[in-house]
Amino acid sequence: MQLKALLEPLVTRMGYQLWGMEFRVAKHSALLRLFIDSEQGITLDDCTEVSRQVSALMDVEDPIQVPYTLEVSSPGVDRPLFEAGQYARYVGEQVRVRTQWPIDGQRNFAGAIVSADEDSVTLDVDGREVRLPLEAIARGRLKGTLPPATQVEE
């Protein structure tokens, strides 16, 4: 069973969206990172509770055969993008994308999302449109911007 198919129903039942997941294997260990989201935002307590529930399920199902660390967090301001619908949700926003292989001689792209469908994402990179097949995208991330700090008058 795929990890997403195992974990997404649990996270959804808890009232959260499984925004995405990363699984990285190093020489002697692995890291499973889950990104959760909700309309109300995510707190540290939310992450802790999801971590507890996911850990219990993983102990029973045992889908990972190497020692691993589980991390649960919110996607944050510069949230990673995993699926076509996530790119479509942020049309007009600035992103950074790295591809698995060169496209037009490069692998790193930064620009605004023009459009996204189930097959590709189109970016405006310095005034030219670049179409990136979803299967080519290794990593995509919003270029997050924080709102300006409000000044407190004394």
Curated annotation (Swiss-Prot):
Main location: cytoplasm
Database matches in Gene3D superfamilies: Ribosome maturation factor RimP, C-terminal domain, RimP-like superfamily, N-terminal
SUPFAM superfamilies found in the cross-reference section: YhbC-like, C-terminal domain, YhbC-like, N-terminal domain
Cellular compartment(s): Cytoplasm
Signal peptide: none
Keywords linked to the UniProt accession: Cytoplasm, Ribosome biogenesis
NCBIfam families: PRK00092.1-1
Similarity section: Belongs to the RimP family.
Protein name in UniProt: Ribosome maturation factor RimP
Protein's gene: rimP
